């Protein structure tokens, strides 16, 4: 299979390796779409904190389920997944704050990601496509970040929300804050 690796800042290389074989508790996915996130841009540019090279980037993904024993999934299913792999054992995980896991492994940041034809992931992070197409599924992760922010801030109809940055997550924040009934103001350094 082909994959793209960021060997060092400012350098992508196209390489080949065998298709990975899923281990117990893992599934094999064929990548169909991938989003380019600010994290990927910063990693490519050499400014992403806690990052080591070489690394296969990519965590905003849409895929086809190929192989594994995940319950409720059939080969050919359209899927995406949660790219934040937590340990389940640390104090944060035990308290339900898996996003604060002290041992978190972010797919495409701490471990190799999805700029590859095929990937294996732990089956517990797999999500059904729910009728979305591959283009839409690649947006699930950034939109989930936006939805989480609006929910965590407990945005109400009486609120005025300032969104700083009108990239994909910012656009998601705008829409979710409007759904919550808030007045929204947007700032960005890019005029377009």
Segments predicted by a language model, with ranges:
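Cytochrome P450 core scaffold surrounding the K-helix E-X-X-R motif
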Residues: 39-41
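Mid-domain Rossmann-like dinucleotide-binding core that forms the NAD(H)/NADP(H) cofactor-binding site
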Residues: 132-192
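Cysteine-cluster motifs in flexible loop/terminal segments that predominantly coordinate metals
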Residues: 37, 72, 83-130
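Residue-level marker of beta-strand positions
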Residues: 60, 77-78, 92, 118, ...
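Short Gly/Pro-enriched turn/cap motifs at secondary-structure boundaries
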Residues: 7, 18-19, 52-58, 107-111
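Glycine-rich beta-strand-centered segment in the early N-terminal region that forms part
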Residues: 20-34, 47-91, 130-132
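Residue-level recognition of beta-strand termini and adjacent short loop/turns
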Residues: 8-10, 23
